[in-house]
């Protein structure tokens, strides 16, 4: 019988490494704090009060991950921006219902904790929270020996926001004649990477050659998801927004109908914006049909916004003033029979 004394570290879990990570990330989390947050990082739960400016506050929650984009982060040792992706996926989702993101939590799981690597990831999460104006109030770092290969991890994020009950955006007021605007994406964002990786494997491109201006192909592929919170909150404060759709898995084709009444169609003009160079490359190298592109990728449009025609020009001007590239990409019309609710031509 072996009587050697064993420790948790012998089993593969390093509590000291976890403590070191917490100390590393505290200053980054502190920069994200909002006045509604009571207390700091390290408690069993985060306390957040609802501002008294809300008469009938409605909490809006969302959760998401980064998907197989993480495989590229592992392969390329690029961990500094996947945290931004993680935040973007959840805060953009709750934003479309009119919610201002209040706080964010993350879950980081790995087989063996690499403190430097995890610090890079969580610094990115904090940067995303700063972009979104929400507080990083806590998270879970799960070191699980034998569950993940060396150097790999998984991420999940959770966002909670608040909206006045009378200002919830549901899309129910959208009618034929309304205008569809498209806010430019920053690249592939966080969806469609299984196909992206397959195309890269087939094409075997020179990833570090100049590709788009001063960007390499590698830079373009792994560019972080754009966070639309601040410009769209400003827009919602200024004029009525009827509906918004975050263009994620399923592309423009499958996400736009999520905000449309059943009797309407978004008629999208494909000529209203230019397919960005990265998507042109993916389509060419993968020989991907254009309609498959639209139902897989954002194709350059990361967020769809629907407004009344009388507000369209003002909305365009406000968003451009806020630094967004935005296009008038289509119009809502009446649905004919059982046709798909996104028509792109």
Swiss-Prot record:
Reaction(s) catalysed (UniProt annotation): 2-formamido-N(1)-(5-O-phospho-beta-D-ribosyl)acetamidine + ATP = 5-amino-1-(5-phospho-beta-D-ribosyl)imidazole + ADP + phosphate + H(+)
GO cellular component: cytosol
Keyword NADP set for record: no
Main location: cytoplasm
GO biological process terms on file: 'de novo' IMP biosynthetic process; adenine biosynthetic process
Keywords: ATP-binding, Cytoplasm, Ligase, Nucleotide-binding, Purine biosynthesis
Protein name (database record): Phosphoribosylformylglycinamidine cyclo-ligase
Organism annotation: Chromobacterium violaceum (strain ATCC 12472 / DSM 30191 / JCM 1249 / CCUG 213 / NBRC 12614 / NCIMB 9131 / NCTC 9757 / MK)
């Amino acid at each position: 019988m072996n009587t050697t004394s064993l420790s948790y570290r012998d089993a593969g879990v390093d509590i000291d490494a976890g403590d070191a990570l917490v100390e590393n990330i505290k200053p980054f989390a502190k920069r994200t704090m909002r006045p509604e947050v009571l207390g700091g990082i390290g408690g069993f739960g985060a306390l957040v009060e609802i501002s008294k400016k809300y008469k009938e506050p409605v909490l809006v929650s969302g959760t998401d991950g980064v998907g197989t984009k993480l495989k590229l982060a592992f392969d390329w040792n690029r961990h500094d921006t996947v945290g931004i992706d993680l935040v973007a996926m959840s805060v953009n989702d709750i934003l479309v219902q009119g919610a201002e993101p209040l706080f964010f939590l993350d879950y980081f799981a790995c087989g063996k904790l690499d403190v430097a690597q995890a610090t890079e990831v969580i610094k990115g999460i904090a940067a995303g929270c700063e972009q979104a104006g929400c507080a990083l109030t806590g998270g879970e770092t799960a070191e699980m020996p034998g569950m993940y290969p060396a150097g790999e991890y998984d991420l999940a994020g959770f966002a909670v926001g608040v909206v006045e009950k009378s200002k919830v955006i549901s899309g129910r007021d959208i009618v034929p004649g309304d205008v569809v605007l498209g806010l430019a994406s920053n690249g592939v964002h966080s969806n469609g990477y299984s196909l992206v990786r397959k195309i890269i494997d087939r094409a075997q491109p020179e990833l570090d050659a100049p590709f788009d201006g001063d960007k390499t192909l590698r830079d373009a592929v792994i560019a972080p998801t754009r966070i639309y919170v601040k410009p769209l909150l400003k827009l919602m404060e200024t004029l009525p927004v009827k509906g918004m759709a975050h263009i994620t898995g399923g592309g423009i084709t499958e996400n736009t109908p999520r905000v449309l009444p059943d009797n309407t169609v978004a008629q999208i003009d494909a000529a209203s914006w230019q397919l960005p160079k990265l998507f042109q490359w993916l389509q060419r190298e993968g020989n991907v049909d254009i309609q498959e592109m639209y139902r897989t990728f954002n194709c350059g449009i990361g967020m769809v916004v629907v407004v009344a025609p009388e507000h369209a020009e003002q909305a365009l001007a406000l968003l451009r003033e806020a630094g967004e590239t935005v296009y008038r990409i289509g119009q809502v019309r009446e649905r004919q029979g059982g046709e798909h609710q996104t028509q792109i031509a």
